[in-house]
Amino acid sequence: MVDGRKPHINVGTIGHVDHGKTTLTAALTTVLAKRLSGEGNKSVKYDEIDKAPEEKARGITISTAHVEYETENRHYAHVDCPGHADYIKNMITGAAQMDAAILVVSATDGAMPQTREHILLAKQVGVKDIVVWMNKCDVVDDEEMLSLVEMEIRELLTKYGYPGDDIDVVKGSAVKALEEESADGVWSEKIMELMNALEKIDLPIREKDKPFLMSIEDVFSIPGRGTVVTGRIERGVIKVGDKIDIVGLRDIQSTVCTGVEMFHKALDAGEAGDNAGILLRGIKKEDVERGQVLSAPGQIHSYKGFKAEVYVLKKEEGGRHTPFFSNYQPQFYVRTTDVTGNIKLPDGVEMVMPGDNISIEVNLDKPVAIDKGLRFAIREGGRTIGSGIITEILE
């Protein structure tokens, strides 16, 4: 960890429209600002969150509000999206990679269509942990009703592959917590109970601890030294003398890293997040190309086929003006390269309209180094028309 900073975790509110996601976000910041000191704890009003600034991720505009808060042990970055379509885009493009999600369900309605859709998407994009905030409990005075809603949510979470029986379900009211004068009030206590549930979530393993992987952006030949490839190290660490594989587009080649450079300085090692140049032993410039990856031996393979969850841009977002059908052949921008591929739609789906999100099967023209959870853009004539995440590799 850098200079004694608190461990950091990314969370987001998910759930059906009008169930109180944004109100909860405001209540979290307000109660924590009253209860705990800390630079990160500033009360954020509902309107500030609701008028979320726009960001771009993979060429797609998404309205997201980022707030932060902290406890004694951790720092949280919290994302809330005002619009339902923004949630889907956000989850698929990974504009904010959530380590954990707070599922907001209204006690008056129970699970609704978007509740299901968000849980399913959370699972597919790799959100490991969920805690549940049952909102609007102040207007339900029937305990049995609350128990039924809780049971329904637990069953739904189990259905989509989460440990429904073990997940924390906190019953509260975001509006009441916001209105309370006292920070020790009964509804504010519920907010603290939710924070305690978040505190129990395992900290994510950051990418440095994973096997080395770097996507090649450029290839140079340096007279007297050999071939250097450059790119951003996606995960892991590379040291001089490490064995590495070159994977994708061609047969796997094995080599050894004989040098690591950053900003024209020689280093002993490069790590996740670094933009580095890697010198490769015995590899000619024409043996390697942009779009391949360097990897720790045996850690990644190249494939042509995969299943994915994709979001297709609307016309107003710069996407297509017309639907597409099965066997549509756009380019897939995977890591650092465009590869043409063929799209197969699910049985019973005739066509995909701009603005849809859909599960597809893809067959690429050339094998590329891919893994489950990898995000990609779909392009046509050099512009992004969709975005996706790989949910399954097809051998």
From Swiss-Prot:
Magnesium listed as a keyword: yes
Taxonomic placement: Bacteria, Pseudomonadati, Pseudomonadota, Alphaproteobacteria, Rickettsiales
HAMAP family: EF_Tu_B
One MF annotation (Gene Ontology) recorded for this entry: GTP binding
Keyword terms: Cytoplasm, Elongation factor, GTP-binding, Hydrolase, Magnesium, Metal-binding, Nucleotide-binding, Protein biosynthesis
Family annotation (NCBIfam families): EF-Tu, PRK00049.1, PRK12735.1, PRK12736.1, small_GTP
Gene assigned in the entry: tuf1
Residues the entry annotates as binding Mg(2+): T22
Domain tr-type G: residue ranges: 6-205
Annotated region (G4), positions in chain: 135-138
Stated name of the protein: Elongation factor Tu
Compartments in which it is found: Cytoplasm
Sequence positions that bind GTP: 15-22, 80-84, 135-138
G2: region residues: 59-63
Reaction catalysed by this enzyme: GTP + H2O = GDP + phosphate + H(+)
Region named G1: 15-22
Positions of the UniProt region annotated as G3: 80-83
